[in-house]
Design a protein with these regions (language model features):
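Short amphipathic helix-loop junctions that connect adjacent transmembrane helices
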Residues: 55-72
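Helix-to-loop junctions at the C-terminal end of transmembrane segments
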Residues: 86-100
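A late C-terminal transmembrane helix in Major Facilitator Superfamily
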Residues: 155-178
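Small-residue hotspots at the loop-to-helix junctions and early N-terminal turns
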Residues: 69-77, 162
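Pair of pore-lining "gating" transmembrane helices in MFS-fold secondary transporters
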Residues: 32-53, 132
Length: 178
């Protein structure tokens, strides 16, 4: 609206097409790119796990540690602060140092370790000790998206990212229900 389009006209997608406006159309686009299926699965499963966490945490915290809504809210606020720190300050540095592939592995490993700590924590302080480790899980998402964009042509990158957003939304709908 205020800033001009930065993408050169030669690299822009063709005009709007109703064929691409189907609700599952963007997800069907992923079928044409088998080289990214593994990375797409990582995006879906990581987001699936992410969406289960806030929807069940209050119940888990009460059953495991006797934390009520107030304490659970404080913990979720800390999770949010740690997420901001990782996203704003650490991801770029870590990816520069490790590269995307290793950053994905580190991020996913930290997520697994964090969830293992959460599940085996016998006390609240043990659970809280897992928060900084689990926060590093956020490294995986942008690195995965970067690798996906490297695997497809520039003419479909926006549509592929849209398809990923659709899958993330689908995970957000399905995961809490399970």
């Amino acid at each position: 609206f205020v800033l001009p389009e930065s993408l050169p006209k030669a690299r822009r997608s063709p005009a709007f097409d109703w064929a691409h406006a189907k609700p599952m159309g963007s997800v069907h686009l992923l079928r044409d790119y088998p080289q990214i299926w593994g990375l797409v699965a990582v995006v879906f499963l990581a987001n699936f796990a992410h969406f289960v966490y806030p929807s069940t945490f209050v119940l888990f915290a009460d059953a495991s540690f006797g934390w009520k809504e107030k304490e659970a809210g404080y913990v979720l606020a800390v999770v949010g602060v740690l997420s901001v720190i990782v996203n704003a300050l650490l991801i770029g540095k870590i990816v520069k140092r490790l590269g995307e592939r290793r950053a994905i592995l580190v991020g996913l490993s930290c997520g697994v370790i964090g969830f293992l700590i959460y599940g085996s924590a016998g006390s609240g302080w043990m659970f809280l000790a897992g928060l900084p480790i689990s926060a590093l899980w956020a490294i995986a998402t942008p690195s995965t998206q970067a690798l996906i964009t490297q695997q497809v042509g520039p003419e479909v990158q926006g549509r592929i990212q849209g398809a990923l957003s659709s899958l993330v939304s689908l995970a957000g709908i399905v995961a809490p229900a399970l």
